[in-house]
């Protein structure tokens, strides 16, 4: 019997050893694995202020006047205080101060969701664009939305307490003959991306800080990352103007009254031509 057992599998041997009244014991099937939980990023209990604060150094931001042509890749709307740009395209942001800040001053950029119901969520790239990251990203972690272009001194920070992402660069004074310092930012995910911003509006907060992290100045603007910045800017500005216009009065019910022909509204005043730059 021992020799025969060598030729049989252990499962068959166990079945032969069982009594006639015993039910056959089949090998136990492995328990099904529970599905892995979806990745959920922690919420932040810290919501940074977005209130404009020029501070002692008169800190403010400026933007180029790029117009609304189809070819533009980045354009700023002073009416909406909103930047429209394409994914990963250069977005020049000008920093202006009334007096030089102290040595060691830094400039921080951080994105937050604009609507209060989403403010505790950390703004990050969608999973697709995170996976598409390559060596050209340089120092930037793949999950960071905001990048600084052409600055090897940029630091990408993940706050251990608030979980928020930011990018910090040293403040550099304006060049001779210029009144502003320009930082070139990139936004690395579309506003419509599922799993990322998912059509939720965001604000970019730019802060001026001393070497210890103390606030010297703050400014912010809304950002929309889209395929056609010029078209989207025109559309949103038109919708904004329609909301601002007073509603026309309903016509009188009686048709007997004749309105005077001299009650025509005065012609709209011509707008002054805009300068080449906008400042906030």
Swiss-Prot record:
Name used for this protein in its record: Cellular tumor antigen p53
Annotated segments matching region Disordered: 234-280
Positions of region (Interaction with DNA): 224-231
Domain remark from Swiss-Prot or TrEMBL: The N-terminal and C-terminal disordered regions undergo liquid-liquid phase separation (LLPS) following homotetramerization and activation. Post-translational modifications, such as phosphorylation or lactylation affect the ability to undergo LLPS. The nuclear export signal acts as a transcriptional repression domain. The TADI and TADII motifs (residues 17 to 25 and 48 to 56) correspond both to 9aaTAD motifs which are transactivation domains present in a large number of yeast and animal transcription factors.
Modified residues (Phosphothreonine): 235
Upper classification of the organism: Eukaryota, Metazoa, Chordata, Craniata, Vertebrata
Region entry Required for interaction with FBXO42, spans: 63-187
Domain of life according to the entry: Eukaryota
Gene name of the encoded protein: TP53
Protein localization: Cytoplasm; Nucleus; Nucleus, PML body; Endoplasmic reticulum
Phosphoserine PTM positions: 9, 133, 220, 266
Residues given in the record as Zn(2+) binding sites: 126, 129, 189, 193
